[in-house]
Regions:
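PP2C/PPM-type serine/threonine phosphatase catalytic domain
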Residues: 1-136
Length: 136
């Protein structure tokens, strides 16, 4: 892990150290332009598993453990953006399940692997089913 990354993780750790928790929320809505919700999120293991026009989740996050939070923006105008964002959210949820007990450098590597795996899955699905893309 380079010095810049180490500083980032230490800053986050210091900010979260203490007895208080952090109340978080995620909301995704289809908006006024699209017919379907192409976006997704990851919040304490919750993702938008439905095809509804909006989704939400709430969580109190403890400073005593690592958390993976994610935003996955399905690429608008490309068919299957909602599939790509959901698949990516699922990959990151599985990766985050491995965080407990890991060091910052191990978490960084798990995150890198999650990006790589999600990219591989989307590329494979894209050629077969015209799945779009997502920004994570």
């Amino acid at each position: 892990m380079n010095e810049k990354s180490r500083g980032f993780f230490e800053t986050i750790k210091e900010a979260l150290t203490g007895s208080s928790s952090c109340n978080t929320a995620a909301l995704s809505d289809v908006g006024c332009v699209r017919d379907n919700n192409e976006d997704n999120f990851l919040l304490r293991g919750s993702i938008n598993d439905s095809s509804s026009s909006h989704a939400h989740a709430n969580a109190d996050l403890s400073p005593d453990e690592w958390h993976c939070l994610g935003l996955f923006d399905g690429m608008g105008g490309i068919a299957g953006g909602e599939i790509a964002s959901k698949e990516t959210a699922q990959v990151f949820r599985a990766s985050a399940d491995q965080f407990p007990g890991k060091s910052p450098s191990e978490i960084q590597e798990l995150t890198r692997q999650a990006f790589s795996k999600a990219n591989e899955q989307i590329n494979a699905a894209r050629s077969a089913n015209k799945v779009g893309g997502t920004t994570a």
